[in-house]
């Protein structure tokens, strides 16, 4: 047994694979590790068609790479817009146009009924040929160890701003932990780990959760979104538009922005929003 004075749980997260019949097939990959990438490359050597379940950043990056490798790619998006919680409709349309320009098909409101070795059958009966299927449906925190130990956890291990759990001298950090919102990003995990380490060693440091930007490169274009990009129905936004950029203001303050194509000003824009 190991003895400790302070303990940090950093159990991470695992890919969420929806309970679709056939999702455990040899041609289905949820990409999380280098081993998963190696599997994709091996299957892609003989595959002609690929389907990507999930239209988030990682799914679209995978779709872009597969298209570059010469595969015929179809993206299956559950919702009616790509990345609806993060980008506005105009940015989503920009992405759709870029995808079409690279020959990548997008099906929205597309729910998978089953997967087999030759493709995906949708709930509405449509058949998508795919010898390779990538599932990109988000992650789920690995919390079983914490729950078995009596640590408070629902979707994530619950921590305060010092990364403390409900048990004395037990901390948690990274994708497994949350103060209420989790972006499951490396930068966030690194910041949380630093705070947990300081406090576990007897220091006193508090974690400040910051909004995280969305950055995407693929299909010959790029996209950046940060802050509130017009998603609140009860807010009267003022929208400023320039070629490849939209700025959202509310109450006289800049609250969000979306850049498409040329995103070199993303750091400047981020600072302007944070300072507003």
Positions of the model-derived regions?
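Glycine-centered tight beta-turn/hairpin loop motif at sheet-sheet or coil-to-beta transitions
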Residues: 1, 123-125, 220, 242
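Short hydrophobic core segments
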Residues: 2-14, 53, 73, 128-138, ...
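Glycine-rich dinucleotide-binding loop and its adjacent helix/turn
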Residues: 6-69
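Redox-cofactor binding/interface segments in oxidoreductases and associated redox assembly factors
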Residues: 9-10, 52, 122, 135, ...
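FAD-binding beta-loop-beta segment adjacent to the flavin cofactor pocket
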Residues: 15, 157-171, 228-246
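FAD-site-proximal beta/loop scaffold in flavoenzymes
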Residues: 24-47, 118-121, 126-198
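Rossmann-like dinucleotide-binding cores of NAD(P)H-dependent redox enzymes
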Residues: 49, 58-113, 207-223
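Mid-to-C-terminal Rossmann-like scaffold of FAD/NAD(P)H-dependent oxidoreductases
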Residues: 176-267
């Amino acid at each position: 047994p190991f003895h400790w004075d302070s303990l940090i749980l950093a159990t991470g997260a695992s890919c969420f694979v929806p309970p679709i019949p056939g999702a455990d097939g040899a041609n289905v990959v949820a990409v999380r590790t280098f081993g998963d990438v190696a599997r994709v490359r091996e299957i892609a050597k003989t595959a002609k068609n690929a389907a990507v379940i999930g239209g988030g950043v990682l799914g679209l990056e995978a779709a872009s790479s597969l298209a570059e490798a010469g595969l015929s790619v179809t993206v299956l998006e559950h919702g009616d817009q790509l990345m609806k919680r993060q980008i506005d409709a105009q940015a989503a349309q920009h992405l759709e146009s870029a995808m079409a320009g690279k020959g990548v098909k997008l099906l929205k409101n597309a729910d998978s009924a089953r997967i087999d070795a030759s493709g995906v059958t949708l709930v509405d009966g449509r058949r998508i040929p795919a010898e390779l299927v990538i599932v990109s449906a988000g992650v789920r925190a690995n919390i079983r160890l914490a729950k078995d130990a009596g640590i408070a956890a629902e979707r994530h291990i619950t921590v305060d701003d010092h990364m403390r759990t409900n048990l004395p001298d037990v901390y948690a950090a990274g994708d497994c932990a949350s103060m209420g919102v989790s972006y499951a990003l490396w930068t966030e995990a690194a910041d949380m780990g630093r705070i947990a380490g300081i406090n576990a060693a007897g220091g006193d440091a508090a974690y400040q959760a910051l909004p995280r930007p969305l950055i995407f490169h693929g299909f010959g274009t790029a996209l950046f979104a940060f802050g509130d990009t017009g998603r609140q129905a009860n807010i009267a936004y003022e929208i400023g538009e320039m070629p490849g950029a939209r700025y959202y203001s509310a109450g006289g303050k800049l609250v969000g922005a979306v850049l498409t194509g040329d995103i070199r000003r993303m750091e400047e824009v981020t600072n302007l929003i944070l300072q507003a």
